[in-house]
Amino acid sequence: MSKGKIIVAMSGGVDSAVTAGLLMEDGYEVIGVNLRTWEYEAPACDTTKKSCCSPEDIRDARDVGISLKIPFYVIKMEKVFQEKVIDRFIEDYQHGKTPNPCVECNTFVKFGALFEKAKALGIDKIATGHYARIARNGERYAIANGIDVGKNQAYYLYGLSQENLKNVIFPLGEMTKPEVRQIARRMGLPVADKSESQEICFIPENDYRKFLEKKNVEFTPGFFKLKDGRIVGKHKGRENFTIGQRKGLGIAWKNPLYVISIEDDGSVILGEENETYNESFSVIDLNFQGLAPLNEGESLECRVQVRYRHIPIRCKITKMKEGLIVHPLEDVRGVTPGQSAVFYPLDSDYLLLGGIISKGSIQMRVAEPAISVLN
């Protein structure tokens, strides 16, 4: 007996292909869709084949559909992708932030817009090839870590709503990547041994600077400064830098220097290794999953992850009128505005909530006058 219809987002890779195959074996009527998010004549898709927006990947996804004998469609998502992902990506760099476009894509495109398309077709369920699981905490649903530590993608999925979480299936959450490839070979899927993309889909060769230049973004030049206000160099654009960066600064100093803050006036603040740790930071644009929304003034001890592959550390969070204040209870460095922070219970692996890192705790002392050491 059929379990009903389900839409599977198919990128052309092995993970989504196996997802479709497993759901078929489980009794679902699978409909495969590929999300067209980018204009294929654009350089971002002409210069690389390892991109989920490339024509090659659409053909691979279609070949999987033929192999599995399921319906397959390409859905146009260029407009929402431009507005919610690319425009925000550019805007964040223009404001001295380091964006995380994969989070925005999952929240607004792969799950937000795709769920709307599914509903319009009378289909409630969708599935993807993410390495994540669904957990319950009382009446609330939450993303939980996939068991493959090296592939776990929970960090990128904190933006899913309760309605999304009730109706999404992640068949790969209990599997490892080698197991997925083995299943693909058993199923005879044409992408069983296809290599993975490690790039942002619209950024060829991961060169975001070149992408910004092609979008005619004006870079903001300024000075390299120390925390005490001393000027130690010039740069051609704050957009070239991110928090924690050490290489490519071009500054000769007695000890290695790191980017610890990027200012609105174009100044890039540098510090030595012991100056890279954060005392507190704020998180905005919150989405609560396993935890019911906090009231202003409420506090909670939990764990925070401040970037992908960062091991969560203990912290105390306090709900403010706008977002949270986070006080780490263990050392953390390189907290970066524009990146996401996700929060876990102290003793479990499901997401309580997540949001965007707004502003670090670094306070810069301005020397009067600033002492220049430029040649």
UniProtKB/Swiss-Prot annotation:
Report the record's disulfide bonds.
105-201
Q: Record keywords: tRNA processing included?
A: yes
Q: What is its main location?
A: cytoplasm
Residues forming the catalytic site: 105 (nucleophile), 201 (cysteine persulfide intermediate)
One GO cellular component term of this record is: cytoplasm
Write out the residues that bind ATP. Answer: 9-16, 35, 129
Any idea of its EC number? 2.8.1.13
Q: Name one Pfam family in it.
A: tRNA_Me_trans_C
Spell out the residues of the site Interaction with tRNA: 130, 339
Give the superkingdom in one word. Bacteria
Cell location:
Cytoplasm
Sorted alphabetically, the Gene Ontology BP terms of this entry are:
tRNA wobble position uridine thiolation
Ranges for the region named Interaction with tRNA are 151-153, 307-308
User: What keywords would UniProt list here?
Assistant: ATP-binding, Cytoplasm, Disulfide bond, Nucleotide-binding, RNA-binding, Transferase, tRNA processing, tRNA-binding
This enzyme catalyses: S-sulfanyl-L-cysteinyl-[protein] + uridine(34) in tRNA + AH2 + ATP = 2-thiouridine(34) in tRNA + L-cysteinyl-[protein] + A + AMP + diphosphate + H(+)
Instruction: Tell me a Gene Ontology molecular-function term this record carries.
Output: tRNA-uridine 2-sulfurtransferase activity
Q: Which NCBIfam families match?
A: PRK00143.1 (NF001138), trmU (TIGR00420)
Q: Which PANTHER family match?
A: MITOCHONDRIAL TRNA-SPECIFIC 2-THIOURIDYLASE 1, TRNA 5-METHYLAMINOMETHYL-2-THIOURIDYLATE -METHYLTRANSFERASE
Task: Describe the task this protein carries out.
Answer: Catalyzes the 2-thiolation of uridine at the wobble position (U34) of tRNA, leading to the formation of s(2)U34.
Q: Which family does it belong to?
A: Belongs to the MnmA/TRMU family.
Instruction: Quote the protein name from its UniProt record.
Output: tRNA-specific 2-thiouridylase MnmA
The organism is: Leptospira interrogans serogroup Icterohaemorrhagiae serovar copenhageni (strain Fiocruz L1-130)
UniProt lineage? Bacteria, Pseudomonadati, Spirochaetota, Spirochaetia, Leptospirales
